[in-house]
Every structure is written in structure tokens, then in C-alpha cells.
UniProtKB/Swiss-Prot annotation:
Pfam families linked: DS
GO biological process: glucose homeostasis; positive regulation of T cell proliferation; spermidine catabolic process; spermidine metabolic process
Primary enzyme class: transferase
GO cellular component term, pick one: cytosol
Protein name: Deoxyhypusine synthase
Naturally occurring in which organism (per UniProt): Rattus norvegicus (Rat)
Keyword Metal-binding carried by entry: no
Function: Catalyzes the NAD-dependent oxidative cleavage of spermidine and the subsequent transfer of the butylamine moiety of spermidine to the epsilon-amino group of a critical lysine residue of the eIF-5A precursor protein to form the intermediate deoxyhypusine residue. This is the first step of the post-translational modification of that lysine into an unusual amino acid residue named hypusine. Hypusination is unique to mature eIF-5A factor and is essential for its function.
Originating gene: Dhps
Pathway assigned to this chain's UniProt record: Protein modification; eIF5A hypusination
Lineage: Eukaryota, Metazoa, Chordata, Craniata, Vertebrata
Length: 369
């Protein structure tokens, strides 16, 4: 190049490639992964995620968020603090942080059911939100098992054999027949109580009743019933439960489920909470229902999303936490985290680093009906 001394690199290229850096903030963490020369220490391995980068670092931040929720939840309240127990419509005592857990139905179909059951059994969360499948699949598993299969199994052949596929899980259709046999007498009883005792059924009351009737400690909703943890499912008819309610309406019509009372219930849990935390696995109605309840208090104090959805189609499922901040569903001074990952991989690890580390601090499970 003209003007460049022989044997010297072009000055413009040198300036571009060897541009000097400004100093990073002093609190910037250095990237450092786990050193397996230390042996296999799973707690230390998961701690190292925080400085590993990418979604591992988001996982580490999610651990911090959930531990912050737990720390506030376990703080003793002042004696003169107003509990608003008459307004929340809940039999659960107020704590320093009300934790909302939302999850889609496929997670109950999977082995994440057992992780969720652990949290509910030990009173670690305060409000559950799920879909119809998130209720019925738990109950059905008490009647018959779900099996591992393959994502690649052909739908035509499965249908011919009465096998339903949920990703790489298989549910024999006979399971739903057993569910119908179990559920129909309960629906009959609910209609009778509605007509003779004036019982006003809601989705949450129905789910609590089903948890009582299943009477199986393997069930999420058995423990939700015992520990007075409300389970909200605004789309309760969108699944096998809805199919059974539909069929039952011909045999014994008249069952009414009031979703407005449940709307007041979840909103009041947020409004009168001292602080709130959201842990949301997946997207759709469960994600928005929890976030919208927290709008009623000008946003949640803590939030963790775990899902694989992207924001580029404008979906609520894919929306990052910052979009919820714009709506007032997460507080402006919060530090929410989204982990872009399959919850079946991440959620048990998150519980292992948070709730399970503090199991002794939570009150003993209740055992009365």
C-alpha cells in the first residue's frame, strides 16, 4: 500500500484490530467454569454455572432470585402487621413473600411432577396456577402410569393402538377411561351438593375436592388440599376434565363453575401480599394469569421464567421479563431472570440449589383434611 513502509502492517488495520479497551466496571465477574480436578461436587458445579456464561449464568441468577424470595418468605413478620386474612380468601398465613408457581400441563406429564409435589408437600409455595392437563395428568398418574417413548413415533400407528403421545411420553387411552370411571361419581356428588346445600363451585374448589378424593400422597393436589394451597386453573375445561364435564352434562346436567370468584382469589393473593415472587415454567395462560394478578399490586418483586419461547412473534409466552415491566406486572426495581431452557432439565436443579437447601426452615406439612 502506498505510504506504508516496507515490512510494516497498514496503520489503519493495526488501529482497527488492536483498538484499546476502556476499563470494565470493577464489579465485573470473570468467566470461570467448574474444574473437575476438584472431583465431582454437584453443589459446587451448579454454583460455577453463575460464572460459566450463556444460559448457565442465567441459571445462576435464577438461583439468586429464588433464594431472595425464600429469604423474605422466612423472615418473621411484625406482631402488629396487618395480615389481611379476611381479604385474601385464603386459609394460609401471610409470610414475607407470597410465591406463585405456574407450570404447563406437560410438566406434570413428565417427572417434574415429583419436583412440584415436593414444593407443595412442604409448604414452600403459596399459589399454584396450571392448565386442565396440569390437574388431570396428576390425578390420572394415581390411577395408571405414563410411559417413556420416542418423539419419532408415528401418530397414525399410535392412534390405531389407542396410545397418546406427549413429546416422548406415552399415555394409554385406557388411562382416561379409568379417569372417567373415577371422576363421574365425584361430579354427581358435586351437583348434589350444589343443588341441596348451595355449594358454589369454582375451579379451585373443584381441584381441592379432587385432591381430597384422590387421597394419594403421590399427588400434587392431595398436598395442595391438605396445605390449603389454592390451585387456579382459568382454562380448567380445556382438557380431559372438560371432556368429562361435557359428557357428564348430558347424564346429570347443571354443574356450574364460577371463574369470577377465582379471579378475585388470585388477585387478592397478590394485592395483600407483603412481597411476591413468580416462578413460571412454560408460557401461555399460566404465565399471563400470574403476571396479571401481580399487576394489581404494581408488579412482582421477584420473577423467574423458564421456557424456550422467543419474543419475535409477539407472543406472551416468549415475552422477556422486561416486557412485563412495561405493563406493571414486574416492578421497575426488580431483577427478573429468564432462563432459555427446557424446564425438565433446569427446574430440578433450581430446586436443588434453593428450596431443598432450606427444607428444615419451612413449617411441617399439615395433615388434617
Amino acid at each position: 500500500m502506498e505510504g506504508t513502509p516496507s515490512g510494516a502492517a497498514p496503520s489503519s488495520a493495526l488501529a482497527a484490530v488492536l483498538k484499546h479497551s476502556s476499563a470494565l466496571p470493577p464489579e465485573s465477574a470473570q468467566v470461570q467454569g467448574y474444574d473437575f480436578n476438584r472431583g465431582v461436587d454437584y453443589h459446587a458445579l451448579l454454583e460455577a454455572y453463575g460464572t460459566t456464561g450463556f444460559q448457565a449464568t442465567n441459571f445462576g441468577r435464577a438461583v439468586q432470585q429464588v433464594n431472595a424470595m425464600i429469604e423474605k418468605k422466612l423472615e418473621p413478620l411484625a406482631v402488629d402487621e396487618d395480615h389481611h386474612e379476611d381479604l385474601t380468601q385464603s386459609r394460609r398465613p401471610l409470610t414475607g413473600c407470597t410465591i406463585f408457581l405456574g407450570y404447563t400441563s406437560n410438566l406434570i406429564s413428565s417427572g417434574i411432577r415429583e419436583t412440584i409435589r415436593y414444593l407443595v408437600q412442604h409448604n414452600m409455595v403459596d399459589v399454584l396456577v396450571t392448565t386442565a392437563g396440569g390437574v388431570e395428568e396428576d390425578l390420572i398418574k394415581c390411577l395408571a402410569p405414563t410411559y417413556l417413548g420416542e418423539f419419532s413415533l408415528r401418530g397414525k400407528e399410535l392412534r390405531e393402538n389407542g396410545i397418546n403421545r406427549i413429546g416422548n411420553l406415552l399415555v394409554p387411552n385406557d388411562n382416561y377411561c379409568k379417569f372417567e370411571d373415577w371422576l363421574m361419581p365425584i361430579l354427581d356428588q358435586m351437583v348434589q351438593e350444589q343443588n341441596t346445600e348451595g355449594v358454589k363451585w369454582t375451579p379451585s374448589k373443584m381441584i381441592s375436592r379432587l385432591g381430597k378424593e384422590i387421597n394419594n400422597p403421590e399427588s400434587v393436589y392431595y398436598w395442595a388440599h391438605k396445605n390449603h394451597i389454592p390451585v387456579l386453573s382459568p382454562a380448567l375445561t380445556d382438557g380431559s376434565l372438560g371432556d368429562m364435564i361435557f359428557f357428564h352434562s348430558y347424564k346429570n346436567p347443571g354443574l356450574v363453575l364460577d371463574i369470577v370468584e377465582d379471579l378475585r382469589l388470585i388477585n387478592m393473593q397478590a394485592i395483600f401480599a407483603k412481597r411476591t415472587g413468580m416462578i413460571i415454567l412454560g408460557g401461555g395462560v399460566v404465565k399471563h394469569h400470574i403476571a396479571n394478578a401481580n399487576l394489581m399490586r404494581n408488579g412482582a418483586d421477584y420473577a423467574v421464567y423458564i421456557n424456550t419461547a422467543q419474543e419475535f412473534d409477539g407472543s406472551d409466552s416468549g415475552a422477556r421479563p422486561d416486557e412485563a415491566v412495561s405493563w406493571g406486572k414486574i416492578r421497575m426495581d426488580a431483577q427478573p431472570v429468564k432462563v432459555y431452557a427446557d424446564a425438565s432439565l433446569v427446574f430440578p436443579l433450581l430446586v436443588a440449589e434453593t428450596f431443598a437447601q432450606k427444607a428444615d426452615a419451612f413449617r411441617a406439612e399439615k395433615n388434617e383434611d
